């Protein structure tokens, strides 16, 4: 008789323990149900990068003096600078400048050490192509200014990059 009562007691304790664990799981689920979705509908919602975001490099051909500092400070010697020495001016004349963004690690050393500030980082991060050879940008492609996400009326901008704290969940879509 006492053995039966002990079995019922242990069974009821285990059932209560299991119900407690199931309740804790439901509480986590209900906690996440109150939050807004963080999923980004990519073509229609885009991230607005921060000020220090390192995107595609913009190049200004007229400012470049062909000093090749960018090549020397690049960890992978990536920029290709072709120049010709002009004897009458006793100066280097830049002919072509190219960067292969399929290899670039976007470290920003070339931008930081450029003495004439002809290189700058843009907020363009959409560099996907079907052929990797299309990522080799010459001085004409590097000189093209990117379209700003803020200026596109068809796109909603997302304020933060990635992590949103629990208290700042509402209103993370930029209503412009």
Swiss-Prot record:
Localization in the cell: Plastid, Chloroplast thylakoid membrane
Lineage top rank: taxon: Eukaryota
GO CC, one annotated term: chloroplast thylakoid membrane
Entry note: cofactor: Binds 2 [4Fe-4S] clusters per subunit.
Lipid metabolism as UniProt keyword: no
Cofactor(s) needed by this chain: [4Fe-4S] cluster
Membrane topology: Peripheral membrane protein
A Pfam family hit: Fer4_7
Residues the record lists as binding [4Fe-4S] cluster 2: 74, 104, 107, 110
Keyword annotations of the record: 4Fe-4S, Chloroplast, Iron, Iron-sulfur, Membrane, Metal-binding, NAD, NADP, Plastid, Plastoquinone, Quinone, Repeat, Thylakoid, Translocase
Enzyme nomenclature, EC number: 7.1.1.-
Enzyme class: translocase
One Gene Ontology molecular-function label: quinone binding
Gene3D superfamilies listed in its UniProt record: 3.30.70.3270
Keyword presence, Repeat: yes
One GO biological process term: photosynthesis, light reaction
Residues involved in [4Fe-4S] cluster 1 binding: 64, 67, 70, 114
Reaction(s) the record says it catalyses: a plastoquinone + NADH + (n+1) H(+)(in) = a plastoquinol + NAD(+) + n H(+)(out); a plastoquinone + NADPH + (n+1) H(+)(in) = a plastoquinol + NADP(+) + n H(+)(out)
Ranges that cross the membrane: none
Segments forming domain 4Fe-4S ferredoxin-type: 55-84, 95-124
Subunit structure: NDH is composed of at least 16 different subunits, 5 of which are encoded in the nucleus.
Assigned protein family: Belongs to the complex I 23 kDa subunit family.
Annotated function: NDH shuttles electrons from NAD(P)H:plastoquinone, via FMN and iron-sulfur (Fe-S) centers, to quinones in the photosynthetic chain and possibly in a chloroplast respiratory chain. The immediate electron acceptor for the enzyme in this species is believed to be plastoquinone. Couples the redox reaction to proton translocation, and thus conserves the redox energy in a proton gradient.
Protein name in UniProt: NAD(P)H-quinone oxidoreductase subunit I, chloroplastic
Organism this protein belongs to: Mesostigma viride (Green alga)
């Amino acid at each position: 008789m006492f053995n039966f009562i002990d079995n019922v007691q242990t069974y009821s304790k285990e059932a209560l323990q299991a119900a407690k664990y199931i309740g804790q799981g439901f509480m986590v689920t209900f906690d996440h149900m109150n939050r807004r979705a963080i999923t980004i509908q990519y073509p229609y919602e885009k991230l607005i990068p921060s000020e220090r975001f390192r995107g595609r490099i913009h190049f200004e051909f007229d400012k470049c003096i062909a000093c090749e500092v960018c090549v020397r400070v690049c960890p992978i010697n990536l920029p290709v600078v072709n120049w010709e020495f002009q004897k009458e001016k006793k100066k280097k004349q830049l002919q072509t400048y190219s960067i292969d963004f399929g290899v670039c690690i976007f470290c920003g050393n070339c931008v930081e050490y450029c003495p004439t500030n002809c290189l700058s980082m843009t907020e363009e991060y959409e560099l996907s192509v079907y052929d990797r050879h299309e990522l080799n940008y010459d001085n004409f492609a590097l000189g093209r200014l990117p379209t700003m996400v803020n200026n596109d009326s068809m796109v909603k901008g997302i304020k933060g990059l990635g992590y949103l704290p629990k208290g700042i969940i509402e209103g993370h879509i930029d209503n412009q």
